[in-house]
Amino acid sequence: MKIGLIGFGKTGKSVASILLENNKFCLEWVLRQSTVLEHRSVPEFFGVQSDEPGLIYSSSKTSIEELLNKHPVDVIIDFSSNEGIYTYGEIAAERKVKIISAISHYKEKELQLLKKLANKTTVFWSPNITLGVNYLLFAAKFLKKIAPWVDIEVNEEHFKKKQGTSGTAVKIAEALDIDKNNINSVRAGGIVGKHEVIFGFPYQTVRLIHESISREAFGNGVVFVAENLENKQKGLYNFEDILTPYFTV
């Protein structure tokens, strides 16, 4: 499966390293805003031997259309920003290139665009693409269904410079139908990401906790999603769509 990666920040780099390790995927190229590292290869950047091209391009000098003409891919993985979808979405959808977006925050306008693109190709979006946190969300919804009256609080912890409430915490609150004021945020040091859902019963407490140890967790999530989207028809998918069949008895 040929992959194009949008975004090469800390998380993008971690995702790229995981893709290079998996022989089911071929990292064809990386597109980023900066001209730093332009025309170098990802394997060279990591100092590893690989047959995968993984060439790095700058969006200021190379258009997505030009890139897809020269190096067609099956899937585009987006770890850039909420604005990124405007640079490649329409072109990718026209060419039936699958889209996996791991952008934590989208405005309503971008969400509507994703729905529009899903009429032409397979689109997946999750504000947190790690497997573990989506297992947590799945289990939390199940518990809420059993005890809809239970008190629920959400705690989230991230690195010092992360601004605003995490998209994952917001999604958890929305999925459990609780007020966003029930989200408690901590910013300290280099915490990659930790989410805790507390269910307060009268005589007992249930805590569901997920903690990302390193950003490679996002890469493992990408691999899982890409494998499960391979035979999916056009449409807009989320993690619940992919996980539900695994829980069917």
In which residue ranges do the predicted regions lie?
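Rossmann-fold NAD(P)-binding glycine/threonine-rich loop
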Residues: 83, 88-90, 103-123, 134, ...
